A protein has these predicted regions:
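N-terminal glycine-/serine-/threonine-rich beta1-alpha1-beta2 phosphate-ribose binding loop
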Residues: 1-148, 164-176
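Non-transmembrane alpha-helical segments in soluble domains
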Residues: 10, 66, 92, 116-119, ...
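C-terminal helical cap and adjacent loop that interface with cofactors, partners, or active-site loops
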Residues: 12-16, 30-41, 64, 322-461
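Predominantly a Rossmann-like dinucleotide-binding segment in NAD(P)-dependent oxidoreductases
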Residues: 57, 172-178, 183-295, 328, ...
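ADP-ribose/adenylate-binding Rossmann-like module
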Residues: 147-159
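Short N-terminal edge-element motif at the start of the domain
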Residues: 292-295, 301-305
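Active-site beta-strand termini and strand-to-loop segments that position acidic
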Residues: 303-309, 333
Length: 461
């Protein structure tokens, strides 16, 4: 019996090693292949004075991006595409109020592949992609192949192979591919970026990021809408499937993939999967399709990333549990810590005018002088307009403002294709780690060792 158990243990251990080594070999294969294009880390294209944009997906996120884009100077909407006719016509009617230049807008709906027809017929400069997760990679790849820059909702892709395909296509076509991580444009995130750049909290050591947002109500969206497809991801996958809202900002605080440091490995663990099944059991008939699913994804996932410099980043995801919203947004250095939800600061020796030591947080009105001195220049310039326009407190508008500004002036984007893939890679890597009882997973280096020559993100004036 002892020998039998030992054989089973060896067999299971070997399977885990094989699975991990297979992923590693796949990553090394891509790493060792020379790129057929040019590195895109600091890429800038020639200025586009009048940006002709098409939109794919007009359900949840698309309408907000459409409004923010269309209200900016130098923009023209040339096509709208969605599975559903009412979404397309509703946004077309709204568009007339936003942008008088967009008079000849082509409308597409009804067929799963209408977006491909749209790309061929309209030939836009840029395409905004706001669809279900599985469509992100094929849509951004085809967009670039058809000659347009791609701007995609999060996550950028759901497998590392898709991410390599995106990187290779971007390098080959010399087209931007930006995953639109809007949280990087939040007021507090911009403030913290500025504080980190100015060395206020010393050498950066540790970060904590999250997307904890109870979204069980989306299961009401059963035939169309986010819940109609996202619920199946909860059932079929187990890991951190939505890492970038919390991770994007702290990665840029740390200059991850931008000349200073890079993610190295991740370990991941999930709790039991209980909340979705209990919610379905309570709210739907026994034979309802949500009660026929076996929910695989744990209610809460916790992942821990190790960087090349030895820093640590904790990333959590929970869209199921009854608890308040948070993204953590914590960055810790040798002389202080910045944290979110609520916004608070602790500095060695205290925050001037607020606290006497690092043993208590400065928060609320006590942070007024810190905002006054260290407010990010971009928020000083556009923040009031962004808050008026709305979209998650103005962060959505600021993101679109910067996209348009960079394209019109021929500047590098604030988020490059490698960052979008790296941040999204926590998804499939965490799934692999959870499946292997927390075994470390190596991050692919989508830059092929060129990250250490990439410039840090500027503090944009």
């Amino acid at each position: 019996m002892k020998n039998y158990n030992r054989r089973n243990f060896i067999k299971k251990s070997t399977l885990g090693v094989v699975a991990a080594s297979t992923l590693s070999v796949s990553c090394q294969d891509n790493l060792s292949k020379p790129s057929s294009g040019k590195y895109m880390g600091d890429f800038s294209d020639k200025p586009i004075d009048n940006i002709r944009a098409a939109f794919i997906g007009l359900g949840a996120r698309g309408p907000g991006h459409l409004k923010n884009f269309a209200t900016l100077d130098g923009t023209q909407v040339v096509a709208l595409c969605d599975l559903f006719e009412d979404n397309v016509k509703r946004e077309h009617n709204r568009l007339k109020k936003y942008n008088s230049v967009s008079t000849d807008v082509k409308l597409y709906w009804g067929d799963e592949n209408k977006w491909k027809v749209m790309l061929k017929e309209v030939k836009p400069n840029i395409v905004f992609i706001c669809t279900n997760w599985k469509n992100h990679a094929p849509m951004v790849i085809q967009t670039m192949l058809d000659g347009a820059h791609a701007f995609c909702e999060v996550p950028l892709a759901i497998s590392t192979q898709e991410m390599w395909d995106i990187v290779n296509t971007s390098e080959k076509t010399q087209k931007h591919c930006m995953m639109m991580e809007n949280v990087n444009y939040g007021r507090d995130e911009l403030l913290y970026l500025n504080l980190c750049r100015k060395g206020i909290i010393g050498e950066l050591l540790h970060a904590e990021a999250a997307y904890i947002h109870e979204l069980r109500f989306q299961m009401e969206e059963q035939e169309r809408g986010t819940g109609s497809w996202r619920t199946h991801h909860y059932a079929e996958r187990n890991g951190n499937l939505y890492p970038t809202h919390g991770l994007g900002p702290v990665a840029q605080y740390m200059n991850i993939g931008r000349g200073e440091d890079m993610f190295k490995t991740v370990v991941s663990f999930s709790t039991p999967a209980r909340g979705r099944a209990l919610y379905a059991e309570k709210n739907y008939p026994e034979n309802h399709k949500w009660n026929e699913l076996t929910y695989k994804g744990g209610d809460l996932n916790t992942s821990l990333i190790k960087t090349h410099l030895g820093r640590t980043v904790m990333v959590q995801w929970d869209e199921t549990s009854p608890r308040p919203y948070t993204r953590h947004n914590l960055i810790q250095g040798t002389t202080g810590t910045l944290a979110g939800f609520p916004t608070r600061v602790a500095l060695e020796g205290g925050v001037p005018g607020a606290t006497d030591s690092h043993h208590s947080w400065a928060q609320g009105d006590a942070l007024a002088s810190l905002y006054e001195e260290f407010e990010h220049p971009l928020f000083k310039r556009v923040g009031a307009l962004a808050e008026k326009m709305g979209g998650h407190g103005g962060m959505d508008f600021l993101m679109l403002f910067r996209i348009v500004e960079c394209l019109r002036e021929g500047l590098p984007l604030d988020q490059n294709v490698y960052e979008g893939c790296l941040w999204s890679a926590v998804g499939p890597l965490s799934e692999a780690s959870v499946a292997q009882e927390g075994m470390p997973q190596a991050f692919p280096d989508f830059t092929r060792n060129q990250w250490n020559t990439t410039l840090p993100l500027d503090i944009i004036a």
